[in-house]
């Protein structure tokens, strides 16, 4: 009997438990369609299976599921409640399609029914003055070289944090100046990115900080055979912002570094199709089907202009005369900030 047949070895009278059917769904759907299925599986193992795992699938009601979501909402975990709802809706819809269930109890519910409407998309991007503070602030904290240079590389390459910390050393050809990321990204599209001199400085620093026998660009300090956890660089940003003598600028996240890079590309008049290629977003309209050009020369030119702009910012002696929010407005740090200066 095959492993799948063993999982699906129960009668067709509707007596299968949630746990039995969810194990099949994980194997046949979740593992095949999710880029990071382990995140979804962890959420199911923590919040769903302990509560309703042993209940017969055909006994699950909308009320019972809402009680499960409400536990998370009552704890203030709105995002997690919405994530669990989305997973449950996907699972019960699949179970209905497969015939394990006559009708999904969540078919008429929408994501906004759990915890209200989604929060609006973030709009935070760092100003020139804040980029200076971010870059030089990294040198003032007692953090690992991996975190310090990985965060800088996130900004310079406009990559998602996961794409940097899960990069392998053999993806980088420093002789040709290209990062061949392949399909290891959110959209699973094959992607290559030209590397600027400033980005190569970051990569060389990460190579120097990585044990020779590790395949990872940013290995974990606890086990060099594993990549650094995404939470590590996220925590660094939080520490720098929340410390008594912190950066002194408005809160931002690692993902906001990517938004900062994209906004910079626009300010440098980079054509939208080139910027989209750098971000690894699909082209718009019919171009997404017929335009197969790799755009590497155009991306190289755009990224070099972006890198030169960043270098001009970080080479400034201070942040006083760097642009901040509006023309003529300058950044004022609180006196307690480690980077506070007097004119």
Task: Identify the function of each model-found stretch.
Residues 2-7, 59-62, 93-118, 321:
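Short, charged hinge/linker segments at domain and secondary-structure junctions
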Residues 10, 187, 197, 201, ...:
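C-terminal secondary-structure termini that scaffold catalytic or DNA-interacting sites
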Residues 14-45:
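Short, aromatic/basic-rich helix-turn unit that serves as a nucleic-acid recognition element
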Residues 33-49, 61-66, 78-95, 109, ...:
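Non-catalytic DNA-binding core/recognition domains of DNA-processing enzymes
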Residues 74-87, 97, 101-161, 165-166, ...:
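Basic, Lys/Arg- and aromatic-enriched nucleic-acid-binding interface segment
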Residues 103, 170-178, 249-251, 270-290, ...:
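Short, polar N-cap/turn motifs at the start of nucleic acid-interacting alpha helices
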Residues 114-125, 138-142, 162, 173-201, ...:
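Basic, Lys/Arg-rich DNA-contacting stretches centered on the C-terminal catalytic core
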Residues 132, 136-147, 157, 193, ...:
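Short, basic (Lys/Arg/His-rich) helix/loop patches that form interaction surfaces
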């Amino acid at each position: 009997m095959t492993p799948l047949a063993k999982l699906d070895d129960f009668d067709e009278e509707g007596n299968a438990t949630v746990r039995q059917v969810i194990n099949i769904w994980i194997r046949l759907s979740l593992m095949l369609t999710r880029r990071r299925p382990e995140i979804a599986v962890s959420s199911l193992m923590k919040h769903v299976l302990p509560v309703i795992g042993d209940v017969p699938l055909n006994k699950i009601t909308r009320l019972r599921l809402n009680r499960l979501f409400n536990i998370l909402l009552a704890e203030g975990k709105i995002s997690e409640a919405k994530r669990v709802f989305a997973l449950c809706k996907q699972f019960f819809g699949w179970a209905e399609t497969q015939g394990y269930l006559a009708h999904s109890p969540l078919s008429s519910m929408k994501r906004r029914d759990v915890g209200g409407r989604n929060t609006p998309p973030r709009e935070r991007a760092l100003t020139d003055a804040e980029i200076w503070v971010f870059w030089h602030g990294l040198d003032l904290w007692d953090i690992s070289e991996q975190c310090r240079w990985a965060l800088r590389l996130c900004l310079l390459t406009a990559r998602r944090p996961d794409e940097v910390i899960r990069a392998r050393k053999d993806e980088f050809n420093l002789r040709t100046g290209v990062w061949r990321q392949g399909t290891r990204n959110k959209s699973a599209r094959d992607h290559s990115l030209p590397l600027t001199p400033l980005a190569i400085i970051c990569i060389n620093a990460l190579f120097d900080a990585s044990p020779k026998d590790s395949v990872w660009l940013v290995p974990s300090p606890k086990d060099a055979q594993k990549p650094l956890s995404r939470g590590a660089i996220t925590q660094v940003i939080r520490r720098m912002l929340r410390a008594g003598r912190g950066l002194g600028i408005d809160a931002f996240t690692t993902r906001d570094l990517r938004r900062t890079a994209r906004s910079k590309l626009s300010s440098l008049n980079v054509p939208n199709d080139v910027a989209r290629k750098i971000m690894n977003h699909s082209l718009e309209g019919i171009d997404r089907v017929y335009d197969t050009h790799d755009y590497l020369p155009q991306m190289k030119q755009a990224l070099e202009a972006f890198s030169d702009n960043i270098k001009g910012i970080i080479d400034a002696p201070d942040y006083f005369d760097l642009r901040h929010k509006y023309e003529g407005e300058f950044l004022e740090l609180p006196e307690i900030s480690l980077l506070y200066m007097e004119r």
